[in-house]
């Protein structure tokens, strides 16, 4: 009897919901032309207006921040049927299929959003259209990022996720819960080699070490401790042999990984952004995945310099990085990094000459996190007042350097708050970056289109199904990385590799000195 009553109530509820949905879809349409003109565009949140959007992005749902009792929205373009929505609340949720069809049919065209709001007096007000350009260039289908809490030193729920940018689907890549609650970070994907990825892990629990570099190559997943593959005297300071790999970059051939070995510590200020990080020592080296060996050269592991943030040119002929003169921690605000590069021949292993691309004395700022565009024309980097940890620098801005002319400029898309970690799409027409522009505390991911001349469009916030999502989401997005394919290994396989001994398939590997001679 109770079961029949429950089923009856459930059926009634479903019927009412269905009727409500039907009525919502079939409410009388609004005559936009007859509505009174507001003579201004509507206020919406997130601010998806006057920008360029990817043709393959998920629907840009938004809130209409105008008081009213009824809302009508029409989204249209030159080709195809417009999307018409009607709601008694300000949430605008766009149907996925119709959105995709509209954007795909109108690549390179404008997208117009018309909004009408009915006030308490029953009268409709029509706002000026919001117009965005639909790019002809697609953005990469996937975005990788780490989600962390904005705390100082406790590793709580440190997870790396991947998001399908065509939808709202988010899936776990790896969680620190799979190996005792340590740290997982610095995920790096190989350009043109979707089956390859690395990430770094840190942690010791109950006498078990989870420290190491997880290397994924075409189905094989293993943990490597780069410290065991280098002689302690490889560099004058031996930092490569003492510190684990940190920031890294795959060579375009997918066989070599440049990485930094850093000795850093966190400290705190009394006011403002209280968190900060100081780099006491850092060097660069190469991990050769096929041979399972590590090599370096004195020019990238000097005892009188700090070298970090490696980044390859798309042809693999140059390794870009940041370099600074070390100073005591009491002088941390005097540490400013130069932008450097050095030639490299992957076929012979020979190094070229060291070159200063852009000195900090010229900019007056610390230059970090260099990333070269896929066509080799542009270099995107961060500049901040000092140091090598721009995510904690409110002064951090994005700069674009023309590698042909060596001219650089501060991008117009920067905010008064921290704009930091960034990457390029595979086609070089989009950048993704982390920004704290909303509140100064939580970093969110934004996208901007970059045209052939280096002009960058107004940033687009990573869309969510619920347009009010970011108002209550209390985690920060860290290290956004675009990718053309999903993660090449399951979270279970990555967890097994993290928990495995770090020697594993690396047992018996030996250090190899670099070939003598330099590039001509």
Feature locations, PLM:
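Sequence signature of WD/YWTD-type beta-propeller architectures
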Residues: 5, 16-520
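N-terminal Sec-pathway targeting helices
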Residues: 1-13
